Amino acid sequence: MSAEVLEQPVLGSRRLSNYLVAAAVSIGGIGFLLASLSSYLGRDLLPLGHPAALIFVPQGLVMGLYSIAAALLATYLWYVIAVDVGGGSNRFDKAAGVVTVSRRGFRKPVLVEIPLKDVKAVKVEVRDGFNARRRVALRIQGRRDMPLTRVGEPLPLAQLEQDGAELARFLGVNLEGL
């Protein structure tokens, strides 16, 4: 961090949990495909169980449809991971007087530029419960709050407070929400 520019990377969809889900869906889809083919061919293609004993219509056919659904879902998940949807950065440039929030989207990048003079405060939002939310956002004059933290897994409270305080100190604005 220099005295004039602060850049914060934002983690997108390249998280361990997304890799594990995509791998599980892929393996499950292959299992359903092999079970369906075993049922159709009358030979066991899977080392576990005896899918050749299944009647192709309707059981083997339905497993084939499950394998198609799993292949489509796995393709989507691997694409989201490859593109790193949601990843990007927050750049605060005092010299240029601008905040730049950039994220990677499905088809094109999302780029939002906000003049520093419009930033009124840094807001730390903590909501616990079933749908927990922990985020740092910019309070902007005449606009809705601009979230700065990643989507998904909530940040630890200590890190959230530290990030909010560091950003408020850098921008010279108040810290709200604690």
UniProtKB/Swiss-Prot annotation:
UniProt keyword list: Membrane, Photosynthesis, Thylakoid, Transmembrane, Transmembrane helix
One Gene Ontology cellular component: plasma membrane-derived thylakoid membrane
UniProt-listed Pfam families: Ycf4 (PF02392)
Spans traversing the lipid bilayer: 19-41, 61-83
Primary localization: membrane
Membrane topology according to the record: Multi-pass membrane protein
Compartment(s) of residence: Cellular thylakoid membrane
Gene Ontology biological-process entries: photosynthesis
Reported function: Seems to be required for the assembly of the photosystem I complex.
HAMAP family (alphabetical): Ycf4
Family: Belongs to the Ycf4 family.
Protein name: Photosystem I assembly protein Ycf4
Provenance organism: Parasynechococcus marenigrum (strain WH8102)
Higher taxonomy: Bacteria, Bacillati, Cyanobacteriota, Cyanophyceae, Synechococcales
